[in-house]
Amino acid sequence: MKILSYDIESTTGSHCDGSMCTFGYCLADENFNIIEQKDIVMRPNTRRYETKIKLHYEKAYIKAQPKFPEFYNEIKSLMASADYIIGFSVL
């Protein structure tokens, strides 16, 4: 059994405006042993960056990353391989 937990960070504080910049996840087995963990950092589809939001990565680093379509298949495969998915702050 595989359990996927993930969190999405955005540059604006909203997850529905194309500002997603990080998809961080942890994949664990049924005993909660970590199989894999990773931060997928991507350039958002917006130029807005809220100054009140403290991001884990520098703005220049985020802007230099590929956009979401480059990671879509990786994220889709990850989700398809999990038996349970737990998302934090996904709305």
Can you name each region flagged by the protein language model?
Residues 2-4, 8-91:
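Conserved non-catalytic scaffold segment of RNase H-like nuclease domains
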